[in-house]
Structures are given as C-alpha cells and as structure tokens.
C-alpha cells in the first residue's frame, strides 16, 4: 500500500542524504512511528466505543444508531489492524487487555492479526447501513471494499474475490460515466469513502 513518496524507490532529496537514501530508517523514524502510534490510538478509541455500547451506556441512542456507531467502531478496528499487519507484519493484538497486560504484550503473528481484522470487518458489514447521504461514513460496501483490499495485499485471493463480488453485487457503487467530469463533481457513485477537500 504505497501512499506517500517516502515509500517510493524513486524518491529523491536534492538537499543531501537522509534516512531513506542512506538506509537508516528505524522504528522511531517519522512516518513509521507516526503511523504505528496513530493506528493504536484508533484501536483504543474503537475498542472503548464498542465496550461503552455493549455496556448499555449509550442512553438516548436508538437501536439503529447504536448499530451504526458499533459498526463504525468495528470498521475502524478492522481497518487499523489491517493497516498494522500490512505495514508492520506481526504486531500486538489488543482485544481489551489491561494496562498491566499491555506492558507484557508480545507481537501476534500477522496471520492471526489479519484473521481478527477480517472478523471486525465482518461485524461492521453486518451492522453498517447500505448507504449514507455522504461518503464520509463507512457503509457495508466500504467495509467490503476495505476487506477486499487487505485480502489482495496479503495474497488471500479467495477472500478478496468474495468481498469484491459482494460489494459489486450491492449495485451501490459503479464507475463514473465521464472520467473527465469525475473531478468536477461534488460526489460520484465511484467514490466509496472520502473526505472532501477544499481546492482554494
């Protein structure tokens, strides 16, 4: 999942040597450390939301909204662990350990982490609605698409094909009719999950 020039083998800094070009990247290097920390913050927050909703502390929230919020939290949990396994391989799998247990935690094999990511995404698929008015919140199709993407990254072809087929069969998403107009429109059936930016 290349998502920045610092992961590209064609990267060039004109101002001299750096950690990328001289091969001295460590676990404390900017992007590596930031991504690791951010993903574990997402895990902690999503877990807290799920625990709160399971404990019935969501007074005043109806069942439909409870399912939506829980589905979004499971989506975030599955997404975070999928990213962790993709970028780092074996990593700590926290299913609600105490702080004391966390100090003694060891890395879980990548295969087990991905199995848990799939499990969380499957729960999200069950709970999330088919669509929202905007693309800023995950839906069933988005969770299926993310599951398919992670499965592709990890060469899990059968899971990737099944998730992609389910997403396509939902008929919610399709390619934009006119590619040249895609970037002018506020929305498109091709866009699954995005945050709108301001070009000015």
Predicted regions mapped to residue ranges:
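Alpha-helical junction/boundary sensor with strong preference for TPR arrays
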Residues: 53, 121, 128, 170-171
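Short acidic-aromatic linear motifs embedded in glycine-rich loops, typified by GG[WY][YF]DAGD(H)
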Residues: 1-74, 82, 86-87, 91-112, ...
């Amino acid at each position: 999942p290349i998502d920045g020039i610092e992961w590209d083998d064609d990267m060039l800094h004109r101002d001299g040597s750096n950690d990328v070009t001289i091969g001295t990247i460590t676990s404390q290097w900017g992007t590596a450390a930031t991504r690791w920390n951010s993903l574990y913050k997402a895990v902690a927050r999503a877990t807290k939301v799920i625990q709160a909703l399971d404990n019935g502390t969501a007074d005043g929230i109806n069942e439909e909204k409870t399912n939506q919020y829980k589905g979004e939290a499971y989506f975030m949990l599955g997404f975070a662990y999928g990213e962790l396994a993709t970028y780092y391989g074996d990593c700590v799998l926290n299913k609600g350990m105490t702080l004391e247990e966390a100090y003694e935690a060891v890395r879980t094999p990548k295969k087990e982490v991905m199995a848990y990511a799939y499990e969380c995404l499957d729960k999200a698929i069950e709970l999330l609605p088919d669509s929202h008015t905007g693309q800023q919140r995950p839906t069933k199709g988005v969770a299926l698409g993310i599951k398919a993407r992670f499965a592709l990254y990890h060469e899990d072809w059968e899971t990737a094909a099944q998730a992609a087929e389910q997403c396509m069969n939902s008929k919610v998403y399709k390619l934009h009719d006119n590619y040249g107009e895609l970037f002018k429109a506020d929305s498109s059936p091709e866009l699954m999950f995005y945050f709108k930016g301001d070009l000015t």
